[in-house]
Amino acid sequence: MNDNPANAEPQEEEVSLESQPSTPESGSDGSKEAELEAKIKELEDSYLRVHADFENTKKRLEREKFQALEYAYEKIAKDLLPIVDTLEIALKSANEVSGEESELQAKFKEGLELTLDNFSKVLQRHGIEMIACEGEFDPHLHECIMQVPSPSHQEGEIVQVFQKGYRYKERVLRPAMVSIAKSN
């Protein structure tokens, strides 16, 4: 539209400037590309860490769920142990009665024995077992409430059991209360 040659030259210069990429801009494109690649790498690394954390948490929760199910009887078993103790004490008292036993006393004692026997079988059926209290003292299974001199026992050996201990699978529900021999 403009036939003026003075106006035509600057337009050509502008076109020539636009068509030739400048060196600083191409360097910034390269640095932008490097920045973007670094950001992508950082985000990929972050994603992998979050994913690994998620997988670890998932595995931990599965393990805890399995343990909770596996040890579900533990709480009720702890609550039942005093009942077993009471039955054992009652049976011991019934056995210590001196004099002639009446038929009623004999039936009562027999009932206590059967109840205690059934209770013990139920506990065993559900994986609850009594802790053995013979021989050497084990601090993981026994609780020493006193040390006594005993010429018939070696030092550290269990002399007397005051309260039976129980365990459920690998966990100790209640340690056995014992006395152990001490050196003379």
UniProtKB/Swiss-Prot annotation:
GO terms for biological process: protein folding. Residues 17-29 have a biased composition (Polar residues). SUPFAM superfamilies: Coiled-coil domain of nucleotide exchange factor GrpE, Head domain of nucleotide exchange factor GrpE. The keyword Chaperone applies. It is found in: Cytoplasm. Keywords: Chaperone, Cytoplasm, Stress response. Residues 1-35 are annotated as: Disordered. One of its GO terms (cellular component) is cytosol. GO terms for molecular function: adenyl-nucleotide exchange factor activity; protein homodimerization activity; protein-folding chaperone binding; unfolded protein binding. The keyword Ribonucleoprotein does not apply. It comes from the Bacteria. It holds the Pfam family GrpE. CDD domains: GrpE (cd00446). Belongs to the GrpE family. Homodimer. This is Protein GrpE.
